[in-house]
Amino acid sequence: LPAKKKTDQTYSSVLSSGEFHKISIPEDGVYKINSAFLSASGIDISAIDLSKFEIYGNGGGMLPEIILKERPEDLTENRIYVYDENSNNRMDANDYILWYAKGPTTYNYLNLFESYEAIGHDFDVASYYFITWEGAAGKRISSLPSGEQLTPNVTVAQYDHLIYHESNEENHIKSGRRWWGDKMQIDRQKTF
């Protein structure tokens, strides 16, 4: 057996102090947090300091089952774009935060078959991110100065879009991690 990885660090999670709110993410994409979303979630938006707004999460997929494989020690702070219309660092009606989040499904490219394999999460239908506005200034996606433009060196005219459908509704033995899609009855017609 390989030697156990030695660590001299004392582990302390970023979630160990402060107030955090959990957000579920069903699929990969750019997500928007605005005052309406936060208010509907029961959060007092008057307490939010946009300069300190942070989002933590490690994206989709399951942690490795093999104990010796690399895995994150803690949640990673994600870079975010903050639109603060009047630059007052308060969450006003037109202000919002954007960031790219990964859902629970991961994809591997299989060279032999020249296709992708979707790997669903065995235990959940969402991945989770945590938001806070109590710490230091959060990481941001940098913007170009006004009027400055980048010249693209590649123009994309087409791309492959992956669509993955797996409902995981049937477990024949009512136990374990083996799930199947929709139960097929005598009627062979199925509309998706």
Residue ranges and their predicted role:
Residues 27, 32-40:
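A short glycine/threonine-centered beta-strand motif
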Residues 1-26, 41-192:
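Structured catalytic cores of large enzymes
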